[in-house]
């Protein structure tokens, strides 16, 4: 009995001991499960945070690369300036025809898009593109053209170039020459009109008659007035007398409707807030035109018109007509200058007066002494002017106002001026050359007219070069503003806008 009780007691204790052991094991397993869930939750939060950081970094990288790529693409677009325009005229403009027949600003947009695509490509083919950027579309939202505001942007680049090259002080000297011309009235003093008025007075005067006896008996005849100045004055307007011997005149001609001033031009936004040129910049632009354009005395190689400066001044369609108009202008100015000198020279006035006195007395009309004297002075001034212009055309120099030393013809020798040969050294002496005289007239020319004609000349000469047959200045861009739509294969779209220009 005692043994059975002990066994039962022992069994109960063993059962109780087993229960406690199983409980501890169960609690231990529950603790392990709680830790695992906690770690998973922490890892999920950390992973989300890491992914958020990675995505933020990706967005920043996309933004940075987009901005850099856009800036590079815009600069690359400006790098496609027309090479001939730079080489011949030192001007930076994008020719939106890109050597093709049809020009369009859309071509520039496509070029920018192409540069964006190149900039977005991975530099290493083995590397993974973590940004996935694609240039979906590029639009040009604003642009300025060379022809805008009557060539304001072309003039601005030209003036900046000249200021960098020479400064601005040199242009002031030319202004002094123009002031002297205006002060003395060389642009307005019409010697031909003086000669015409004097000749009309002579022609309207009733010459006396004289009694003549011959084999038929006595009869009355009109007294003849033999004025030696008539032979010189009769040659006025004969341009061939001015041209140097054996001169070959250019026969080149253009169709004005083929160039900028003869068509309706495309328009852009112009200066668009950029600093406009001042009135003091106009002489600088004149010097640019003179530097980049040829003329009769100093021609430019490979030009459509051989006498470009003459065309800019007169706008006629042929070299011959422009040269004639220029020679007429130069004769007018030189004749005025020479007439003023003769009238101010006591010695030469006295010579003309003595000759006029003898002519009028021979005609029994002493009242005509003064008008005859004026015709002699006008003829003398004209003969000297023909010599002057002939020398200028051959590359020589003539002072604006002559003195005794620089005066060429005596009263006797001026009657043979038409057959006079240019034998002296053209490089000798001081004064102004042919281009200097053209400068005077260029300074007087209306700014809009001369700018348009110069732009015509630019188009003429650039079109002569390979790949520029359809070149047009109103299709040449100085500044652009572009907007690009960028997408990412990771699900984001971006829009970026940039502007860039050659001139500020």
Pin down the residues of each PLM region:
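Long, compositionally biased low-complexity segments
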Residues: 83, 91-504
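Alpha-helical assembly-interface signal, strongest on the long, hydrophobic N-terminal helix that forms
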Residues: 3-104
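Short intrinsically disordered, low-complexity coil segments enriched in acidic
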Residues: 1-2, 376
């Amino acid at each position: 009995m005692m043994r059975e009780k002990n066994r039962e007691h022992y069994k109960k204790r063993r059962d109780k001991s087993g229960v406690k052991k199983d409980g501890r094991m169960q609690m231990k397993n529950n603790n392990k499960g709680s830790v695992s869930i906690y770690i998973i939750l922490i890892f999920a939060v950390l992973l989300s945070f890491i992914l958020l950081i990675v995505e933020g970094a990706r967005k920043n990288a996309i933004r940075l690369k987009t901005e850099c790529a856009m800036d590079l693409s815009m600069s690359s677009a400006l790098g496609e300036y027309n090479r001939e325009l730079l080489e011949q005229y030192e001007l930076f403009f994008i020719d939106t025809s890109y050597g093709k027949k049809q020009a369009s600003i859309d071509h520039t947009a496509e070029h920018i898009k192409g540069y964006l695509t190149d900039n977005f490509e991975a530099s290493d083919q083995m590397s993974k593109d973590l940004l996935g950027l694609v240039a979906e579309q590029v639009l040009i939202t604003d642009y300025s053209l060379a022809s805008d505001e009557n060539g304001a942007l072309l003039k601005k680049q030209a003036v900046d170039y000249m200021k960098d090259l020479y400064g601005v002080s040199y242009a002031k000297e030319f202004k002094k020459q123009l002031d002297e011309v205006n002060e003395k009235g060389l642009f307005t003093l019409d010697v031909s009109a003086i000669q015409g008025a004097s000749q009309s007075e002579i022609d309207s005067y009733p010459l006396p008659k004289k009694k003549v006896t011959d084999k038929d008996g006595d009869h009355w005849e009109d007294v003849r007035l033999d004025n030696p100045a008539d032979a010189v004055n009769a040659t006025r307007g004969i341009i061939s007398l001015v041209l140097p011997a054996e001169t070959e005149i250019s026969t080149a001609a253009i169709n004005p409707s083929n160039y900028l001033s003869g068509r309706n031009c495309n328009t852009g936004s112009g200066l668009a807030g950029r600093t406009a040129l001042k009135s003091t910049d106009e002489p600088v632009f004149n010097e640019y035109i003179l530097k980049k354009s040829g003329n009769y005395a100093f021609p430019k190689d490979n030009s459509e018109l051989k006498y470009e400066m003459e065309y800019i001044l007169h706008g006629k369609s042929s070299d011959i007509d422009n040269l004639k108009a220029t020679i007429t202008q130069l004769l007018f100015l030189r004749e005025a200058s020479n007439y003023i000198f003769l009238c101010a020279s006591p010695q030469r006035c006295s010579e003309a007066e003595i000759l006029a006195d003898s002519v009028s007395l021979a005609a029994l009309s002493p009242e005509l002494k003064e008008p005859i004297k004026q015709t002699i002075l006008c003829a003398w001034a004209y003969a000297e002017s023909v010599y002057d212009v002939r020398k200028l055309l051959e590359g020589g120099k003539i002072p604006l106002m002559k003195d005794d030393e620089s005066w060429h013809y005596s009263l006797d020798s001026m009657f043979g001026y038409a057959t006079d040969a240019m034998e002296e050294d053209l490089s000798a002496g001081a004064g102004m050359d042919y281009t200097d005289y053209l400068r005077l007239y260029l300074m007087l020319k209306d700014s809009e007219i001369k700018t348009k004609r110069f732009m015509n000349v630019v188009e003429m000469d650039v079109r002569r070069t390979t790949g520029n047959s359809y070149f047009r200045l109103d299709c040449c861009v100085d500044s652009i503003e572009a907007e690009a739509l960028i997408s990412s294969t990771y699900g984001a779209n971006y829009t970026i806008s940039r502007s860039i220009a050659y001139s500020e």
